[in-house]
């Protein structure tokens, strides 16, 4: 099953053809678009980023409160997370990213967190639940990644427990 979203959404089981799972989907959010939609244009940039991050955190918290406690909950996010380690792609990124707080991706009500945007493979919640994983990019963006191993993830997700296998 594949579903593409262009704005933050909470996808419940009935919207996923009855699949026994719930997904909070956070696609790449452009700062300028989000600022305009939240009527924050012209504000101090530091204040704007803080407000955007707070509003996104509140949105996710509200969706978690509305979730079915009996079904697994997955968070997918194309975003940076505070504390994540960047690979060589950092050199090609311009501007300040919208940054998610670590507490958001380590929330125990989540069963798996699938992250994209940062190319360095890493689990931001190593040894704890939920796994919060950047598998890295399967494509190299420049010669700085020529010797980097590339991975994908197999995740067996059940409510309260997720088994993750890194595949090269």
What kind of region is each of these model predictions?
Residues 1-168:
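Extended recognition/assembly regions associated with phosphoester-bond processing machinery
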